[in-house]
Amino acid sequence: MARHIVQAIQSHAFATPYKCALSDSRGDLGYADLDSFSTRFAMRLQDLGCRPGDRVVMLASRRALLVAAIIGVFKAGCVHVPLDPRMPADRLRYILHDVAPTLVIADEDLIDAIEHALPVAAPIVPVTELERLLDDADSPRLDALVQPLPLPPLDERAIAYCIYTSGSTGRPKGVLINHRSIADFFEGTRAVYDVTAQSRCASFSPLNFDVYLMDMLFPLAQGASLYVHDDVNAPDLLFDAIRVHDVTHFSAWGMMLGLIAQAEEFEAAPLPHLKTILTGTDVPDVKTVQRWLRKNAGVQVINAYGPTEATCAATAHVIREIEPERRTLYPIGKPLEHVRALLVDEGGNRITAPGVPGELMIGGTQVMQGYWNLPEETAARLVRLDGVPFYRTGDVCAYLADGSLYYMGRKDNEVKIGGYRIHLSEIQRVINSVPHVYGSEVVLLESRYGETLLAAGVLLERGAPLDADCKADEIRQRLAAELPAYMVPRHVKVLDQFPQLSSGKTDRKALLSILQQRINESNQEEVNS
């Protein structure tokens, strides 16, 4: 099995040249065409001045052609830097100044904003130029090259991508992952995610989110066919994409998995080809997972866990049984093949006993090379244990009796109210167990009197029988029955949806503002009445 993603695609192009590699609403691309286009695009990058190690920014909406362009970036030896095309102007300006790209690939309607944000002039390749390059193998720009440069040799040590995540300082930071980490991640993933050359996969992930590795590139490395869904996350459209394209494998973070299950045809329309669902990013709701397991016999759900700094996913737990009486969250499982996982207490001492919470440390070859231009931050988050660099995740976990890891929440998601330490995820677990609830978030608010209190936002399944106020009362009653009084949120608000970051995670800052506004409106109504 080829280690480098480029080698894998070249191998499939030779063995199955006409097999569909990529498709979307615009058409499809076979493996030979994928290999040919990505080579031509790599040469085009060289023509525009890109050299190995240079950063190539991608600011564009999700589509199959851009997945092919990523392979071209890798062939040129460049660093893929995917950014959210919807990001605020200030954030875009900061990242472009930080990463100093040699070239930018962008949707045409973003070009003016990019030109104003770039610190120094750099070529901007519109997506329409990629379309022309795909349609015309004898591109005149390529003919104009007197002596095309040879493509650089593939190097596992070279940086493959730089993905920007939210930083603890409030500034985004670029996570650097090399090709060896990707190759080892793919090796470990094969043991749990059963994608083969016969699989038909669907991708719903944003291009600027590291899940694209498992969502898009992993299926291509296996020789599978990949359908790339348009940038529209409506439940009915997502469900139809799975049904119409006879999808066997797809991935969706926990909240999106619940969203797709709200499709009008979800219960009635069968999905006979579906085999495996990969979820993660946020904690999957038990009831939502059970609904998917019931879709047809043999479906399995993989609950994967891993920060961007550990190459997408570091642990995985396979769920096959419905377990109708289950009340606890699903484990995040055991480390992948090239990953080491340790739990440590506040003093840095290792924890081995089941049930004892500690911070999760991740080591092995999947760990990042560091943060771009942030040596001090890199040194603070990468610590050496047994001579091996380990990443401090900031996540609190505990061992189960079988050695699996159970996720308990973020260290910074542990709050203190009235002297009591509270893990917000425990409150969410109880809320999500209430019938017709498929998602919840708990936040800390400050009242007008300076009092610290808990508030919960809740998402209900389509067709929930009770109105919002009655359901909120039912949730409060369940919380009061299962949790001590200090863990029961003062306010429970049913919302239509949660604001999302480009990664698909809930935007907790925006949610906090929404809940605060809803609570203020309710208080005003009480005063007026």
Language-model-detected regions and their locations in the chain:
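Conserved AMP-binding/adenylation subdomain of ANL enzymes
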Residues: 173-200, 209-248
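ATP phosphate-binding P-loop of adenylate-forming
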Residues: 38, 157-175, 186-193, 502
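AMP-binding/adenylate-forming domain of the ANL superfamily
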Residues: 1-161, 184, 285, 289, ...
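Gly/Ser/Thr-rich phosphate-binding loop
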Residues: 221-224, 247-251, 261-327, 331, ...
